[in-house]
Amino acid sequence: MLLLTFTLPVVTLLLAHIIRSWFRLRHIPGPFWAKITDLWREHHYIKGDYGDRPMAPYFAIPSLLGMESAMDQIQQELEDQICRRVTIDVVLWMRLFSLESLHWIAFSNKLGYLSEGKDTDGILSILQSKFIGLAGQLCGWIHRTTLRFHFPKSCTGTAVAPSQRKASHRDLLAHFMDASQKNPETLEERGVLGATISTIFAGTDTTGTSLTFFMYYLIKHPAALARLQEELDSAVRSGNLSYPPKWVEVSTLKYLQAVFKETLRLHSTARMSLYRVVGPEGLDLCGERLPSGTNLGCFGYTAHRNEPIYGRDAALFRPERWIEASNDTLLSMERASL
């Protein structure tokens, strides 16, 4: 009975997906199976020109810097909310900030998370449950179906509306729409919405978590906090740090960058094994011979605590390692960072 209860909804979803796919593709001439599956799309992925390539320029630093000023008001709103409180839930507020920021960058629209101080329509709850990630691991059709049913309409509605008109300024949606118009065969219009929403899903949890641990380690290590405060104060006194701070300014603050790198080293946002394919010559690793074509993966937790690369104190939070390292050692540490 329990097995039937579980399998019946799955079979129903599978049949619904097949029927929907058949009606969507039935007019396309070609092999029979092309009418009930979109596996034929895989040649775009093999060629490397499906989706990612048309959008890649918009994730480059020059393009992202064009959105920097749009973040100032979100940053100011976070500061105002924090100043009104004696204590704050850092985990919650960093996630609210990252979600509000990414939604503003993507759609030029505020969700009201910071002003309300809570998860108003349940996006954070969805991320916390890992529902979308698990569904995506199971099967593509489950992922597409569940994403459609569970993503709040407050976001999808905001995303769809601008697609009917010219964007007033250059947010991510406007950039992706341009990419779709220039590359209609490799980036469909419906893919624009998916790509924009995926950016929010991918960035909210990782950004919020990174900011949370950034503050956690500074609070836990007063000496590091004091050194960072001195660097910031010195930059302000010398006129090298404005308010709100700019990326070109903070990117030159060595200790600040070291703290960020050390935080991401100890708490990487990549919580999965990132695979690489062994080259034609094969690979000898830990006494084992791995043949060409083997998928070899390693978790960031393990790679980032590799003592031959990061030192005997690799398990400790010590931002100074990024400043004291020789050029060769620094290059090795950065290459090992996942």
Swiss-Prot record:
Glycans are attached at residues 240, 327. It holds the Pfam family p450. The keyword Glycoprotein applies. GO terms for molecular function: heme binding; iron ion binding; monooxygenase activity; oxidoreductase activity, acting on paired donors, with incorporation or reduction of molecular oxygen. Keywords: Alkaloid metabolism, Glycoprotein, Heme, Iron, Metal-binding, Monooxygenase, Oxidoreductase, Signal. Its EC number is 1.-.-.-. Ergot alkaloids are known for their toxic effects on humans who consume contaminated grains or livestock that graze on grasses harboring ergot alkaloid-producing fungi. Due to their strong affinity for monoamine neurotransmitter receptors they may also have clinical uses such as treatment of migraines, Parkinson's disease and cerebrovascular insufficiency. Residues 1-16 form the signal peptide. GO terms for biological process: ergot alkaloid biosynthetic process; small molecule biosynthetic process. It is an enzyme of class 1 (oxidoreductase). Pathway: Alkaloid biosynthesis; ergot alkaloid biosynthesis. The keyword Secreted does not apply. Induction: The expression of the ergot alkaloid synthesis cluster which leads to the synthesis of fumigaclavines is positively regulated by the brlA and stuA transcription factors. Its cofactor is heme. InterPro entries: Cyt_P450, Cyt_P450_E_grp-I, Cyt_P450_sf, Cytochrome_P450_monoxygenase. Belongs to the cytochrome P450 family. Cytochrome P450 monooxygenase; part of the gene cluster that mediates the biosynthesis of fumiclavanine C, a fungal ergot alkaloid. DmaW catalyzes the first step of ergot alkaloid biosynthesis by condensing dimethylallyl diphosphate (DMAP) and tryptophan to form 4-dimethylallyl-L-tryptophan. The second step is catalyzed by the methyltransferase easF that methylates 4-dimethylallyl-L-tryptophan in the presence of S-adenosyl-L-methionine, resulting in the formation of 4-dimethylallyl-L-abrine. PANTHER family: CYTOCHROME P450, CYTOCHROME P450 MONOOXYGENASE APDB-RELATED. This is Cytochrome P450 monooxygenase easK. It comes from Aspergillus fumigatus (strain ATCC MYA-4609 / CBS 101355 / FGSC A1100 / Af293) (Neosartorya fumigata). The lineage of its organism: Eukaryota, Fungi, Dikarya, Ascomycota, Pezizomycotina.
